[in-house]
């Protein structure tokens, strides 16, 4: 019977893809430095949210403006993490615009 591999799955979300990519690079570098084997970043589909707003507060229903937000997502898997890896990831300082979900 095969031994179960321990895995940490990190899911990152951000509106700015450059900020997201630099955060992924920092996590991968930290994992490699501490002896774990990272897989990724794996890009997930970008979610587009479009808002339609009337330009005028009173009349002119035909005049509308569209705004859009794009949410970029990435997944990182870290196999065989040591306690040193987990401590380094907890102490890692990442930008404020990145949402992080961690599953063990």
Curated annotation (Swiss-Prot):
Belongs to the universal ribosomal protein uS10 family. Pfam families: Ribosomal_S10. The lineage of its organism: Bacteria, Bacillati, Cyanobacteriota, Cyanophyceae, Acaryochloridales. One of its GO terms (molecular function) is structural constituent of ribosome. Keywords: Ribonucleoprotein, Ribosomal protein. One of its GO terms (biological process) is translation. The gene is rpsJ. GO terms for cellular component: ribonucleoprotein complex; ribosome. Involved in the binding of tRNA to the ribosomes. InterPro entries: Ribosomal_uS10, Ribosomal_uS10_CS, Ribosomal_uS10_dom, Ribosomal_uS10_dom_sf. This is Small ribosomal subunit protein uS10. It comes from Thermosynechococcus vestitus (strain NIES-2133 / IAM M-273 / BP-1). Part of the 30S ribosomal subunit.
């Amino acid at each position: 019977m095969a031994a179960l591999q321990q895995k940490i799955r990190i899911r990152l979300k951000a509106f700015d893809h450059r900020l997201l990519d630099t955060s992924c690079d920092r996590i991968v570098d930290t994992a490699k430095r501490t002896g774990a084997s990272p897989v990724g970043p794996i890009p997930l589909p970008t979610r587009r949210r479009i808002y339609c707003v009337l330009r005028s507060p009173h009349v002119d229903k035909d005049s509308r403006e569209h705004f859009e937000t794009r949410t970029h997502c990435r997944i990182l898997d870290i196999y065989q993490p040591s306690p040193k890896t987990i401590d380094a990831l907890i102490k890692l300082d990442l930008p404020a615009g990145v949402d992080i979900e961690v599953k063990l």
